[in-house]
């Protein structure tokens, strides 16, 4: 069994990314079986509670107010609607319900109070609850923990070196500080990134190094493939080679054996076979539902059929 480490070097991670694919997947699957249930995939449903109008300028994001896309700003969904969606997600087989707000940061007031009620309601349904809503204060993190929040998502997106090519309205240090506030409050960290934005292999290694040297490692690591959206600065990027996604999943599994590696945005561009390769490489969580915030996702029926065809089952979680 490979030991869990927090001292991975950039060179070691680059070497892993450049390992022959079959050898890499074999090693990742070996690590996976040492630390994870062999044939269980967590189903997580993601709902956009507040869509569009975000003041950040993330180059990939159609929700940014800086770009002219087909995503129009919408009002925040009411608590009742969100909890109804959570009930449907549970009935469909999801064990985690993730809620997203297109905000730069959380602000105190009625909308934050509503968020806390949503978290409490989701947990009362027996689901894990995850929130992604930008930066937050120490006290806000504490209140989310008191409400029962399972995990807070705050992605790093890419390496520190490439980050400035993607966003200028928030620093890398801001993101790391948010992760530390979440961790100090006793909330699990959900943190990953996006590939296919024009970054090099060293940038992918750099992202993974930052994640893998966090102590403890993130509880879950979303690996996203860029979904090019017309109107954003990255709208004309070519689609990612699916094998690059397999490599990222495999290396993430080797570096962070206990994390849930979540195969996230971009799955609609993957064949069934490519998705299975990602599972073989150590991915053990997917977003489950027809939409990911504002981009398409495979329908639930297709995912259920895929899991059945490969003999996998939905991961069951125990919630307090």
Swiss-Prot record:
Residues annotated to bind [4Fe-4S] cluster: 54, 58, 61
Xref: InterPro entries: Aldolase_TIM, BATS_dom, Biotin_synth/BioAB, Biotin_synthase, Elp3/MiaA/NifB-like_rSAM, rSAM
Reported function: Catalyzes the conversion of dethiobiotin (DTB) to biotin by the insertion of a sulfur atom into dethiobiotin via a radical-based mechanism.
NCBIfam families referenced in this protein's UniProt entry, alphabetically: bioB
Cross-referenced PROSITE patterns: RADICAL_SAM
Entry similarity comment: Belongs to the radical SAM superfamily. Biotin synthase family.
Pfam families found in the cross-reference section: BATS, Radical_SAM
Protein name: Biotin synthase
Pathway in which this enzyme or protein is active: Cofactor biosynthesis; biotin biosynthesis; biotin from 7,8-diaminononanoate: step 2/2
Keywords attached to this entry: 2Fe-2S, 4Fe-4S, Biotin biosynthesis, Iron, Iron-sulfur, Metal-binding, S-adenosyl-L-methionine, Transferase
Top enzyme category: transferase
SUBUNIT field: Homodimer.
Binding sites annotated in the UniProt record for [2Fe-2S] cluster: 98, 130, 190, 262
Catalytic reactions of this protein: (4R,5S)-dethiobiotin + (sulfur carrier)-SH + 2 reduced [2Fe-2S]-[ferredoxin] + 2 S-adenosyl-L-methionine = (sulfur carrier)-H + biotin + 2 5'-deoxyadenosine + 2 L-methionine + 2 oxidized [2Fe-2S]-[ferredoxin]
GO MF terms held by the record: 2 iron, 2 sulfur cluster binding; 4 iron, 4 sulfur cluster binding; biotin synthase activity; iron ion binding
EC number: 2.8.1.6
